[in-house]
Structure formats: structure tokens, C-alpha cells
């Protein structure tokens, strides 16, 4: 069945209460593609890895996309996506979307091909080693990512780095993230 257009400002006015932590997303379409409206703030330390690209459009405010760049020796990098910007993230790029208060974006993801595996990965803040990784075939972004984040949060053993022994945080430390909305472009 053909759907009707969504007026984004009106949808936000009527439905912003649906954007709840820890992911703060709401799937508005989920047939062939998943189209999510995502609000801020969110506070997570995981990096999501999926085998298909992700398209980001920032409707209101700026967001920070933390990545581990597989094309540059797995270097940790920050990409700022400002209001009005769009960005296509290549497949298999570990990424942590950080959204700040009063920001809204749209994320578009392909339906996962049969047999594809999504991963949620946490890195040690001290030595950058992988602390924990959860994997699953993603059929429902809204629930599966949240479940992986909650399981990591509740299990200190999963959060303990095998290399240096540091216990990884499940949310960023207060003041550790620089809000690009408070800077000049």
C-alpha cells in the first residue's frame, strides 16, 4: 500500500515524545529501507557496524559522528554533520552517532540482506582495544540495538578491557563530548 508524505516539522510537533533513550529513534518507514527520525540528546559509547551504507541528514542542529576509519589504519575520527548537511557512511565502518539536545536528524538504512550481521562494538577509552562486541542479524533497529546497549551496561565483565583492565564506560563521561552546536561553523 502506498503511504502518505510525512511533514517533518508537524510530525516532530506531534510525536517528539517517541524519541526515547538510549537510541532516541523512531522508525517511520520499514519496508526495503528503514527511515528513522532521530533526536538528541543521546549518550552511548558503542560503535555500530553494519554491512550496508547509512545515509545521514541533519534537519536541526549539528551532530557528531565518531568513526573508526577502516581506510586509514582504523584511526578514530570525528565527523561533524551540521544542519542541512547529508553524509553517506560506507558499509562496515564502525560509527557512534552522538546527538545533542534539541537536534533532529534522519537516518536511512537498507534492509539487511539475508545472512548479514550487524555488530555493536565497544572500545577501551585508554588503549583503544576492542572490549566487547555483540552481533546479530538486524530485523528491528529500534529494539535490537537498545537490547545490546542495555546488556553491555548491566555486565561489568563485558565492559572490562582484557588488555589493560580498564572498565569501559557505557555512557560518555560528563563534559567529554564537545557540542558543535556551541561553536561557530
Swiss-Prot record:
Gene Ontology cellular component list: cytoplasm
Class of enzymatic activity (EC top level): oxidoreductase
Pfam families linked to this entry: 3-HAO (PF06052)
Cofactor (UniProt): Fe(2+)
Protein residues bound to O2: 44
Enzyme Commission number: 1.13.11.6
Reactions this protein catalyses: 3-hydroxyanthranilate + O2 = (2Z,4Z)-2-amino-3-carboxymuconate 6-semialdehyde
Main location: cytoplasm
Pathway(s) the chain acts in: Cofactor biosynthesis; NAD(+) biosynthesis; quinolinate from L-kynurenine: step 3/3
Binding site for substrate: 54, 99, 109
Binding site for Fe cation: 48, 54, 95
The keyword NAD is annotated on this UniProt entry: no
Metal-binding listed as a keyword: yes
Subcellular location as annotated: Cytoplasm
Chain positions recorded as a divalent metal cation binding sites: 124, 127, 161, 164
Source organism superkingdom: Eukaryota
Record-level GO BP terms: 'de novo' NAD biosynthetic process from L-tryptophan; anthranilate metabolic process; L-tryptophan catabolic process; quinolinate biosynthetic process
InterPro entries membership: 3hydroanth_dOase (IPR010329), RmlC-like_jellyroll (IPR014710), RmlC_Cupin_sf (IPR011051)
UniProt GO MF annotations: 3-hydroxyanthranilate 3,4-dioxygenase activity; ferrous iron binding
Key words of the record: Cytoplasm, Dioxygenase, Iron, Metal-binding, Oxidoreductase, Pyridine nucleotide biosynthesis
Function: Catalyzes the oxidative ring opening of 3-hydroxyanthranilate to 2-amino-3-carboxymuconate semialdehyde, which spontaneously cyclizes to quinolinate.
Similarity section: Belongs to the 3-HAO family.
Protein name: 3-hydroxyanthranilate 3,4-dioxygenase
Source organism (scientific name): Podospora anserina (strain S / ATCC MYA-4624 / DSM 980 / FGSC 10383)
Amino acid at each position: 500500500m502506498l503511504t502518505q508524505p510525512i511533514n517533518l516539522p508537524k510530525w516532530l510537533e506531534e510525536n517528539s515524545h517517541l524519541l526515547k533513550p538510549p537510541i532516541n529513534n523512531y522508525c517511520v518507514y520499514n519496508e526495503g529501507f528503514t527511515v528513522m527520525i532521530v533526536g538528541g540528546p543521546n549518550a552511548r559509547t558503542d560503535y555500530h557496524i553494519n554491512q550496508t551504507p547509512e545515509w545521514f541528514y541533519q534537519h536541526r542542529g549539528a551532530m557528531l559522528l565518531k568513526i573508526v576509519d577502516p581506510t586509514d589504519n582504523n584511526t578514530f575520527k570525528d565527523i561533524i554533520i551540521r544542519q542541512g548537511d547529508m553524509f553517506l557512511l560506507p558499509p562496515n565502518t564502525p560509527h557512534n552517532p552522538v546527538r545533542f539536545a534539541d537536534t533532529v536528524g534522519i537516518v536511512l538504512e537498507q534492509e539487511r540482506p539475508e545472512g548479514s550481521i550487524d555488530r555493536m562494538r565497544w572500545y577501551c577509552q585508554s588503549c583503544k582495544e576492542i572490549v566487547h562486541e555483540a552481533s546479530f542479524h538486524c530485523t528491528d533497529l529500534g529494539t535490537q540495538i537498545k537490547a545490546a546497549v542495555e546488556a553491555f551496561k548491566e555486565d561489568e565483565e563485558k565492559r572490562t578491557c582484557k588488555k589493560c583492565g580498564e572498565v569501559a564506560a557505557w555512557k560518555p563521561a560528563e563534559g567529554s563530548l564537545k557540542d558543535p552546536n556551541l561553536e561557530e561553523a
